[in-house]
């Protein structure tokens, strides 16, 4: 077959004209090395700090992602989020152009998820309508509102001595096995019916411990308003490091929409250790205790996101959909100390960032005083302004009495002869200590808490044997529940503005009427306590 040269040229022309050239520009690189979940990638010239990188999928087709943390001249250091055994040298890595995001919204409530927001409770997929970035800038000074609403934990010793407000950061610190998690779980359980969404972030704990916490929350009905973010000890250091930020983003969803949320980080010591591990593997220079130089920033940027935001911020964020409402995210970070050393690097960092600390002591815990709160060094820097008047009126001298009692008790064991005033103070302190004991998973409403503190302040427990103080309290509470339900309801309803001071001539009629209600309620409480004391054997 012979082709005409003219036909050949026409054929070539038509082929050239019909050729579709499309250029797909992608920023991709090559894996240089993989070690302990740390991947060094060459060629990602446009990668951002904290950007998600796409790695080759696993054998079953599950996508693999990493987090770009080190941006160097010739390479990028990244941590793999999840399994990394299938990634090998020479593999292709692509930039996604996105910062790490997790699902947020009410769809997550009642679920147990991992650090990436993926369900791990076997209850099926989560159909969240939104995702949000895990790293955010905390609200500025102008967007914030002062803390003036209480966040009741239901624990007598905390709500009376170291009260926590909505939007506060209150550190729970102590050695291992001193009841730190128990305090946080009780606080979550006590939020039932308080319009508070809770987030519990478990970092570096045993899977069995996390399972026990979830079971306790389910039994108390607290999973109806709680999200559990779990990064157990079996997961990679990267997942443990990221989990706290993921949980914070889930809590911020509610804060920014004019709702109240509580987040528990259990615990930040393990997060700091995970971050140290990642940093050392990335060859970052170590500092004090081998932590990297930015370990303070690790926790400060996380805890500063817990805040109470004003109505203008909420209105601007929701574009006018929510008006006149403030939002709050209250944080209860937990730090584990070694042999009570609060001056170690991470504990001092977090103490300086937070608005107070609840210090749990091993010696008190072993002596059966639970929660084992040391009244001397536990403090709340902003919570007193958020404390309800009902509790504030009764708890004024409790903390001082308890701190002085512990000091006196230490000296009294060496003294053979004590004066009457000292002996009275020791007796009173022993009874207050006994009354502040509380079993786990039994938070108290403010009305019953007030009744307990009232009985102490009025001296009803002074001549009762120390071993009978708790039975006295239990019996008194039962009497109030059965015979004085209306009184308890009055205290619950009016507790925030409670006022028993004598009425002034310039008080409005409404204020005078309110004071009369409070005074009558206190008189009824006094009569009930007097009557019960006579019948108590």
Swiss-Prot record:
<keyword id="KW-0066">ATP synthesis</keyword>
<feature type="binding site">
    <location>
        <begin position="174"/>
        <end position="181"/>
    </location>
    <ligand>
        <name>ATP</name>
    </ligand>
</feature>
<keyword id="KW-0406">Ion transport</keyword>
<dbReference type="GO" id="GO:0043531">
    <property type="term" value="F:ADP binding"/>
</dbReference>
<dbReference type="GO" id="GO:0005886">
    <property type="term" value="C:plasma membrane"/>
</dbReference>
<dbReference type="Pfam" id="PF02874">
    <property type="entry name" value="ATP-synt_ab_N"/>
</dbReference>
<feature type="site" description="Required for activity">
    <location>
        <position position="378"/>
    </location>
</feature>
<dbReference type="InterPro" id="IPR038376">
    <property type="entry name" value="ATP_synth_asu_C_sf"/>
</dbReference>
<keyword id="KW-0067">ATP-binding</keyword>
<keyword id="KW-0139">CF(1)</keyword>
<dbReference type="InterPro" id="IPR000194">
    <property type="entry name" value="ATPase_F1/V1/A1_a/bsu_nucl-bd"/>
</dbReference>
<dbReference type="InterPro" id="IPR033732">
    <property type="entry name" value="ATP_synth_F1_a_nt-bd_dom"/>
</dbReference>
<dbReference type="InterPro" id="IPR004100">
    <property type="entry name" value="ATPase_F1/V1/A1_a/bsu_N"/>
</dbReference>
<comment type="subunit">
    <text>F-type ATPases have 2 components, CF(1) - the catalytic core - and CF(0) - the membrane proton channel. CF(1) has five subunits: alpha(3), beta(3), gamma(1), delta(1), epsilon(1). CF(0) has three main subunits: a(1), b(2) and c(9-12). The alpha and beta chains form an alternating ring which encloses part of the gamma chain. CF(1) is attached to CF(0) by a central stalk formed by the gamma and epsilon chains, while a peripheral stalk is formed by the delta and b chains.</text>
</comment>
<dbReference type="InterPro" id="IPR027417">
    <property type="entry name" value="P-loop_NTPase"/>
</dbReference>
<comment type="similarity">
    <text>Belongs to the ATPase alpha/beta chains family.</text>
</comment>
<keyword id="KW-1278">Translocase</keyword>
<dbReference type="InterPro" id="IPR023366">
    <property type="entry name" value="ATP_synth_asu-like_sf"/>
</dbReference>
<dbReference type="GO" id="GO:0005524">
    <property type="term" value="F:ATP binding"/>
</dbReference>
<keyword id="KW-0547">Nucleotide-binding</keyword>
<keyword id="KW-0472">Membrane</keyword>
<protein>
    <recommendedName>
        <fullName>ATP synthase subunit alpha</fullName>
        <ecNumber>7.1.2.2</ecNumber>
    </recommendedName>
</protein>
<dbReference type="GO" id="GO:0046933">
    <property type="term" value="F:proton-transporting ATP synthase activity, rotational mechanism"/>
</dbReference>
<dbReference type="InterPro" id="IPR005294">
    <property type="entry name" value="ATP_synth_F1_asu"/>
</dbReference>
<keyword id="KW-0813">Transport</keyword>
<keyword id="KW-0375">Hydrogen ion transport</keyword>
<dbReference type="InterPro" id="IPR000793">
    <property type="entry name" value="ATP_synth_asu_C"/>
</dbReference>
<dbReference type="Pfam" id="PF00006">
    <property type="entry name" value="ATP-synt_ab"/>
</dbReference>
<dbReference type="InterPro" id="IPR020003">
    <property type="entry name" value="ATPase_a/bsu_AS"/>
</dbReference>
<dbReference type="InterPro" id="IPR036121">
    <property type="entry name" value="ATPase_F1/V1/A1_a/bsu_N_sf"/>
</dbReference>
<keyword id="KW-1003">Cell membrane</keyword>
<dbReference type="GO" id="GO:0045259">
    <property type="term" value="C:proton-transporting ATP synthase complex"/>
</dbReference>
<dbReference type="Pfam" id="PF00306">
    <property type="entry name" value="ATP-synt_ab_C"/>
</dbReference>
<comment type="function">
    <text>Produces ATP from ADP in the presence of a proton gradient across the membrane. The alpha chain is a regulatory subunit.</text>
</comment>
<keyword id="KW-0997">Cell inner membrane</keyword>
């Amino acid at each position: 077959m012979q082709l005409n040269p003219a036909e050949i040229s026409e054929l070539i022309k038509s082929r050239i004209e019909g050729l579709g050239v499309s250029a797909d520009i992608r920023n991709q690189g090559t894996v240089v090395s993989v070690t302990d979940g740390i991947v060094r990638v060459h060629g990602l010239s446009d990668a951002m700090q904290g950007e998600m990188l796409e790695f080759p999928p696993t054998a079953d087709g599950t996508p693999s992602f990493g987090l770009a943390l080190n941006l160097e001249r010739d390479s990028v250091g990244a941590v793999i989020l999840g399994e990394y055994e299938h990634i090998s040298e020479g593999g292709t890595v692509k930039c996604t152009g996105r910062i790490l995001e997790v699902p947020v919204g009410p769809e997550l409530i009642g679920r147990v998820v991992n650090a990436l927001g993926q369900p791990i409770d076997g209850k099926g997929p989560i159909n969240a309508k939104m995702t949000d970035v895990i790293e955010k800038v905390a609200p500025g000074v102008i967007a914030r509102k002062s803390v003036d609403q209480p966040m009741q934990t239901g624990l007598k010793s905390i709500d009376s001595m170291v009260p926590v407000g909505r939007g506060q950061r209150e550190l729970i610190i102590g050695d291992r096995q001193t009841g730190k998690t128990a305090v946080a779980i009780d606080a979550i359980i006590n939020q039932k019916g308080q319009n508070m969404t809770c987030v519990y972030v478990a970092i570096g704990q045993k899977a069995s411990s996390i399972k026990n916490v979830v079971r306790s929350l389910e039994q108390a009905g607290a999973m109806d308003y709680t999200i559990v973010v779990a990064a157990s000890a079996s997961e990679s250091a990267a997942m443990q490091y990221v989990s706290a930020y993921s949980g914070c983003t889930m809590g911020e969803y509610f804060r920014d929409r004019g709702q109240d949320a509580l987040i528990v980080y259990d615990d930040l010591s393990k997060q700091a250790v995970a971050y140290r591990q990642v940093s050392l593997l990335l060859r970052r220079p170590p500092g004090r205790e081998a932590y990297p130089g930015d370990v303070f920033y690790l926790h400060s940027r996380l805890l500063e996101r817990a805040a109470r935001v004003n109505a203008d911020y909420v209105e601007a964020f929701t574009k006018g959909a929510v008006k006149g409402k403030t939002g709050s995210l209250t944080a209860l970070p937990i730090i584990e100390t070694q042999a009570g050393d609060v001056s170690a690097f991470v504990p001092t960092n977090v103490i300086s960032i937070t608005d107070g600390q609840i210090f749990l002591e091993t010696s008190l815990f072993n002596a059966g005083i639970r929660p084992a709160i040391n009244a001397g060094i536990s403090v709340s820097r902003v919570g007193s302004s958020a404390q309800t008047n009902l509790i504030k009126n009764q708890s004024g001298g409790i903390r001082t009495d308890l701190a002085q009692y512990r000091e006196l008790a230490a000296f009294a064991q060496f003294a053979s002869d004590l004066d009457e005033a000292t002996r009275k103070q020791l007796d009173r302190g022993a009874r207050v200590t006994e009354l502040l004991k509380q079993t786990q998973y039994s938070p108290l409403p403010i009305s019953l808490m007030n009744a307990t503190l009232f009985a102490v302040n009025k001296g009803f427990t002074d001549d009762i044997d120390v071993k009978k103080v708790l039975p006295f309290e239990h019996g008194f509470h039962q009497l109030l529940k059965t015979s004085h339900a209306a009184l308890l309801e009055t205290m619950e309803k009016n507790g925030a503005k409670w006022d028993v001071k004598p009425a002034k001539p310039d008080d409005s009629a409404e204020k005078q009427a309110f004071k009369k209600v409070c005074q009558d309620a206190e008189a009824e409480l006094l009569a009930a306590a007097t009557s019960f004391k006579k019948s108590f054997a």
